[in-house]
Amino acid sequence: MSAEGVEKLSLEIAASEEESVAPTEQQDVACGLENLPVSLWPLGAEPRPKPFQYTPDHVAGPGADIDPTQITFPGCACIETPCVPGTCSCLRHENNYDDNLCLRDVGSEGKYAKPVFECNVLCQCGMRCRNRVVQNGLHFLLQVFQTEKKGWGLRTLEFIPKGRFVCEYAGEVLGFSEVQRRIHLQTSHDSNYIIAVREHIYSGQIMETFVDPTYIGNIGRFLNHSCEPNLLMIPVRIDSMVPKLALFAAKDILPGEELSYDYSGRFLNQVSSKDKEKIDCSPPRKPCYCGAQSCTTFLPYDSSLYMAP
């Protein structure tokens, strides 16, 4: 083949690859509601993802104690000076992000026992404030794609540096009774998207947040579990006490790599002996296909959600 032919073939291959991943308005899973379109691949795959109403943010569902769209936090008064710890009311301890918008000290799970608060709509610091990251939405091109064994998954089409915000896990914020009702209506063939986030606060109490993106949700619903995930879920509060479930890169993530987090809420599969006992004694569960060396062979199981109401 001539040099001209090789060059033409290379261009055709490049164009074909670009068409296979390049988002278009017609295939935007996010329906134009995110900063960037989210493509679907392959377009003609069957079965198609189950239909759902797209929302980039939490919405109040049945039984929710607080409407996540209500603004309940006061704003900071940082007008002439940048938001820094000690002077900004939103940064009581230390900066949440560095100059590159990366979450600080990613990789230390214990580090994020502390709360993360961003500046909100009532703050006087402006939208260019460094303490506004999660609220600014997607910054990397993502794609919903069909996996070999796990159904639909989510991957990145761009390099994502360690510590950068990737996406939220958004959906209906539910009360516990509604969670139990929905759980008991599920069949063995249904996917469970409901996530329970439990935060231990200084008074010894536990704050619970239940989010279900089954019917109303965002691209976070396509994230699969991994026992060695590349994402870390952090509750981030902006306008109210209802946290945004923000997913950050736990390491550098290469283009084409599937995005995943640990459904159990742990990170890097740090299983305590007590948790291991719960896993061994739990009823039959769905197999895990993450392929990690530390794979527990089954998807995490939260028995508290399956208790009789």
Curated annotation (Swiss-Prot):
Keyword set, alphabetical order: Chromatin regulator, Chromosome, Metal-binding, Methyltransferase, Nucleus, S-adenosyl-L-methionine, Transferase, Zinc
Residues annotated to bind Zn(2+) 4: C227, C288, C290, C295
Record-annotated SET domain positions: 140-264
InterPro entries to which the protein is assigned, alphabetical: H3K9_Histone-Lys_N-MTase, Post-SET_dom, Pre-SET_dom, SET_dom, SET_dom_sf
GO biological process per UniProt: methylation; negative regulation of DNA-templated transcription; negative regulation of gene expression, epigenetic
Residue numbers binding S-adenosyl-L-methionine: K150, G151, W152, Y193, R221, N224, H225
EC class name: transferase
Residues the record lists as binding Zn(2+) 1: C76, C78, C83, C88
UniProt domain Post-SET: residue ranges: 284-300
Swiss-Prot/TrEMBL catalytic activity: L-lysyl(36)-[histone H3] + 2 S-adenosyl-L-methionine = N(6),N(6)-dimethyl-L-lysyl(36)-[histone H3] + 2 S-adenosyl-L-homocysteine + 2 H(+)
Annotated localization: Nucleus; Chromosome
Residue ranges occupied by any Pre-SET domain in the UniProt entry: 74-137
Family: Belongs to the class V-like SAM-binding methyltransferase superfamily.
Entry remark concerning the domains of this protein: In the pre-SET domain, Cys residues bind 3 zinc ions that are arranged in a triangular cluster; some of these Cys residues contribute to the binding of two zinc ions within the cluster.
Protein name: Histone-lysine N-methyltransferase SETMAR
Organism: Mus musculus (Mouse)
Taxonomic lineage of the native organism: Eukaryota, Metazoa, Chordata, Craniata, Vertebrata
